[in-house]
Amino acid sequence: SRQPHMQTSGRRQRHRRRSRRLRRRRRLFGIVVVLILAAGMAGIFLWKRSHTAGSPPTSENKGGSKDTKKKDAQSGTSDYTIELQGDSEVTVRLGDPYEDAGAVVKDRQGNRTDISVSLEEYDLNTAGEHQLVYKATDPKGKEISAQRTVTVTPNKEYGAKGLPICMYHYVYDANSVPENLNSNYIEVGTLEEELKYLHENDYYFPTWKEVREYLDGERILPDKSIVLSFDDGPLYIELAIPLFEKYQTPATSFVITSYYNDKSMLDPYRNNQYLTLESHTDNMHRGGGTYGHGGIFPALSKEEALADLKKSIEYCGNGDALAYPFGDYTAECEQTVEEAGFLCAVTTEPGKCYPGDDPYALTRVRMLGSQSLDQFISEIN
């Protein structure tokens, strides 16, 4: 009675073993299929990649544009270099002649070539470091360059021609002659002749900062340089302002700022591109002193004078230059002006300015209302 049961149990065991073997075979087959598919995809990817890399250029990129060719030719490192002749760093005094030693192009073996080298335009008329740039183009169209450093040191003894700072006062119309007409008044037609002459003869009008650099031996100004200054304020030169604009001629108006109740009253003048407002002090253009013409400036304490000057700077919107009231000043006045932050101060003493002159005691060329154009030209040249 136990034998049939044992036979049934054996069949079941054999069936389970066959099922396990079958499952293992299926899993193994699945793994093999996945590996084959992965290998096939990798092969396709590599084939496409190699085919693309080795394919000839299409009609779109076969020739390329001229600009692209030029850019490709100029990219990368050239086999040629520019070699400076002489020192790569040179020092020269302002105003002294400078002769450039030049440069040549050499190939990778160090052989000199006949490739031409151009030197970019440079200006050594100011003190400081200047970079001289040399350029050339190699046979493949690549641009190569080199630089030489030229340091210009200050020099006050280079033989400057002299800078005229012209001193004008009042401008009037011949149809409305002032009752107190004197040599400080110039007729608007006479002034226009002078401005027209300056414009047509390409005169240069330096800023006060450039004037200071000129005095310190740090800048060479063009031979035809001039500064136009008008004392006492813009109210006295209303007729001149349109002429400054017409002939594109910059001018300075030295303003007595106490004449204006509010600094906004100076806005129309301050915003004019051809008119610069500078200080003629706030309230020191009056008597009360015992020095020179009796101006009050030399008689005031340093604190009082400084407060006055700082107020005038606030009103003018500039503090580069000062005109001494009545031309009166002392060494103490100069120190106060410098402490207030001014770059320059002008007097009424006659003459042109030269490098090395005291920046706080500058001479001026007086402009007379009776002068002819020829006299004007003679005075400034």
Describe every region a protein language model picked out.
Residues S1-K69, V337:
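Gram-positive cell-envelope targeting signals
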Residues T58-G63, K69-D72, Q131, Q147-S225, ...:
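N-terminal pre-catalytic segment of deacetylase/amide-hydrolase enzymes
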Residues D67, D72-G110:
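Solvent-exposed, low-complexity, repeat-rich "mucin-like" stalks and linkers
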Residues G110-R148:
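Serine/threonine-rich, repeat-prone extracellular segments and beta-strand-based repeat modules
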Residues Y134, D223-S225, T330-V346:
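Short, electropositive alpha-helical surface patch
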Residues K161-Y185, P222-I226, P234-Y236, A240, ...:
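Metal-dependent polysaccharide deacetylase catalytic core of the NodB/CE4 family, i.e.
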Residues K196-Y204, E245-T249, E314-G317, E338-L343, ...:
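Sec-exported extracytoplasmic/periplasmic mature domains
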Residues F230-L235, L239, F342-G351:
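Acidic, His- and aromatic-enriched active-site or binding-groove loops in soluble protein domains
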